[in-house]
Amino acid sequence: MVSSVTGPYVTAPGSAAYAAAKGGMDGMMRTIAFENGRFGITANSVAPGWIATHSSTPDELTAGHHTPIGRPGTPDEVAGLIAYLASESASYVTGQSVVVDGGNMIQEPHGVDLYDTDDSAT
C-alpha cells in the first residue's frame, strides 16, 4: 500500500479527511498483516514525503529542498522501496509503514506559524 507521511505521522491545516484516510489505510494494512502472516503473506505500506511528480505544486517542490537530503524525492526512489517490500528478501517484514521522506520528519519545523498568529495584516 502507498500511504503518506500526512495522516499517520504529520498533518497540515485543512487535511483532516486526507489524514484520516491515510491513517486508516495504515490501520487496515496492520490488520491484513496480522490476519495473513501465518499464510506467508506480508502487508506493508510506504509513506512518501515530498516527491517530485508532474502534479507537484511549486510550493511542494520548494518544501522538498528543505529536507535534510536537500531535495524532493523521485518516484523511482519510492518504487525501489516498494520493489524491495514485494521481494522475497523482505519476507520477514510485515505490518510496517516505511517512511521515504529524505529525513524530513527528523527535523523540527522552523519558521512555521501553525496558528496563523501574524497580526501585521490587520
PLM feature segments, named:
Residues 4:
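Residue(s) in the substrate-gating loop at a strand-loop-helix junction
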Residues 21, 29:
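Active-site helix of classical SDR
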Residues 9-16, 38, 70, 88:
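Active-site loop immediately N-terminal to the catalytic Tyr-X3-Lys motif
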Residues 36-38, 51, 86:
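A short hydrophobic alpha-helix cap/turn motif
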Residues 34-35, 91:
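Alpha-helical segment proximal to the catalytic Tyr-Lys
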Residues 8, 43-57, 100:
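Short, flexible catalytic-loop segment of classical short-chain dehydrogenase/reductase
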Residues 94-122:
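Short C-terminal tail/terminal secondary-structure segment
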Residues 45, 61-93, 100-102:
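C-terminal helical subdomain
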